[in-house]
Amino acid sequence: MIHLPILRHGVPYTSLDVVTVLHHRTREPFVEVSQANGGLIRRDLLPERQEAAREALARIPFDRLIAMCTEAADHFLNATLPLGDADQSPDDYVLQLSATTGMPHALVRRNVQRVAGVMREMRTVLRGLTRGLDLSVLDTGHGEHAGHAISFYPRTQALGVVLPSNSPGVHSLWVPAIALKMPLVLKPGSAEPWTPFRIAQAFMKAGCPPEAFSYYPADHAGAGEVLRRTGRSMFFGDVSAVGGWEGDPRVELHGPGYTKILIGDDLLEDSRWEAHVDLMAASIADNGGRSCVNASGIWVAASHAERVADAVAARLATILPRAATDERATLAPFADPRVAERISAQIDSGLQTPGAREMTLHHRGTPRLAAFEGCTYLQPTLVLCDGPDHPLANREFLFPYAAVVPVTPEAMARMPEPMGKTLVVTALTRDQRLSDRLLRSSFVDRLNIGAIPTNQISWDQPHEGNLFEHLYARRSFQQTADPISAAAAGA
């Protein structure tokens, strides 16, 4: 059986404590993963050890780190890399990730390209996050930008990342840390330990110092140690998981997105909204509907809510379970069928509350909960709610789910506040007043105006926070031409 070790500052370590991850379909043991306990994590993350790892990265010029990112992207895509005592080819990686998560091969490969694209375009990504700052300033600690002296200092000695299992694409968010001279402390998702391990191996093959990578498969207590022992971190999880860290400036939270599509009243004329049905369906269902940037709500004037819901439901109903090897597969099964059953039961319970109808069932003709080739799926589900207060109007689940919510004229005039806090809003409108309100609002983290799917991400822009600003702070800085001579003259 495959065994995945811990990485203790780049050094593989096999623990006596292991967890066996099962194949999502056969339920047979597939991989053993060494587990890091809290004591081991605390010892490895003593301040002096974190500082030594950061010094190893800090010595490498920024331009060389950018070159390493490009080389690592190629290795991640194409190389056979170490995997414990064995090796892992690119095809092995796709098969293994699919085996434990259920993600279809086509979706795995698409996410791999997304991660590699960020690594390959690292200079452009960082230029966007820093508003064009020349990051060679990190080599010396100070420099000049637009005629002004600048100096930045690290807020931490390492970036801790507590990761999910829902999609490999999420790893695009933390890989820029290496180019920013920041070591990584990674706690992988329980069903998806593959991608962070492979990325670390790709960087090490490209010449990155091994001590810059710590990899700690662990339980919830171990995840807490990673968050507490690193001065800055990212935490991916659901509301119940991330809620305890809300308000802690050290921890950048990545929870549910409650992403929405807003259809302006101007698009209702002559049924112009119909041209965007495929965009709405793709926003809901792409990548298996498992990302925080997938739409979970479509908000539209009450006069057109049922027509919009019916059209989008008809499109979603064509998405069916397929074999993992089928290039047309877009739905991922649930590794644990009980999770799918619980989610489906929650939706059925919500439908018992008056004011909601499941629109996809009529078009599909089969239940939401489905079995196919020994796997359990939740088929895409669209619910039409009578108003925003219905229990299903603002929910997010781990499959393609969305609610169509009717908007009164009074609520449309106050948009986006009636929708609440939203990670992404795609506004299908040419109404400048509506666009202006969206631009001024603090309720929207990512704003698309026009026919842009909610899941179309530009990685050179912030996503639930700005990684550079999370890791570095600017200080005031002045220096004479010859500090030593100036000090002597003053004496």
List the model feature ranges, each with a label.
Residues 1-148, 318:
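N-terminal Rossmann-like NAD(P)+-binding subdomain of aldehyde/semialdehyde dehydrogenases
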Residues 2, 303, 432-433:
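Alpha-helix/helix-capping structural signal
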Residues 23-36, 62-77, 188, 205-210, ...:
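Conserved C-terminal structural/oligomerization subdomain of aldehyde/semialdehyde dehydrogenase
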Residues 217-227, 333-342, 459:
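Short, conserved secondary-structure transition motifs
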